[in-house]
């Protein structure tokens, strides 16, 4: 806060500029730290935070500023998920604006990446194992689980090419948010199972086959320069957009609907903050909040478009019942899967049996058994 410190005996209130709006925030007065009240301690930390918050922050060009109806401000950092520059942009933005809330493009099913070390995450991201497939199928069902694994294969391909783990900007946001007093950390993305189930429901059987084929045979080389050149449109999302461009319904469920959900979560976070009161007799004091959103660059235009519109997220949180063709294709895929599995087990068992029987020891035992039969 600007201005001179007042003597301890003078109780006064000084307006503090936060996010461009002047609000009355009680000044914390000097005194014995042992006798400071909880309210005074809160106000002291808040004052320190507001002093660090820049009225005219120097922000990266990847930041879009939005203003809520109550004056709260949202700084949306558009990122490339495999970019060192994006990590630096996130750190700089959080340090400049000292937010009250940080919202990231993650859901509870991906929150584990926030606390993994880089080496472990890099190893995990490169591996697309049978265990991961089983977990995805248990969590999302057969078709959605297989689709999730195919998309993980895309991410693993980029990870392998770049030697860089995904989600670095989210981990940086998590670390920086923990350094800002009273800063909350929100998960702002729609749950993965809902997204994949709605995506699968939007495709016909042949569209699913065509998409799976494209994902299975992805092998184009990628360099770090490619990532930075794609800063205006996230590399992972650009690759996905190229593959799903001919499937408008899939683009709607994976991109457009999540734009709506992310916008809703950012608006929920951007609410005026009520300051604590020393007693119930004191009037309520509120200040506009400051929010930093960390999302893929491809979602920024959709968030801007939806910011001032009425949003209904209930309809994008439900999974429509499968159509007749969908049920038929599901049965066909399951039958093909288990048929292939059964044939593979039969073929392996037969080969193993023939191999065992061809061993000299096995032939000797069979000969002894044959000689021991009565009547021979």
UniProtKB/Swiss-Prot annotation:
Record keywords: Acetylation, Phosphoprotein
Keyword Acetylation in record: yes
A Pfam family per the record: TraB_PrgY_gumN
Gene Ontology BP term (one): mitochondrial fusion
Location of N-acetylmethionine modifications: 1
UniProt signal peptide: none
Protein name (record): TraB domain-containing protein
Natural source organism: Mus musculus (Mouse)
Classification lineage: Eukaryota, Metazoa, Chordata, Craniata, Vertebrata
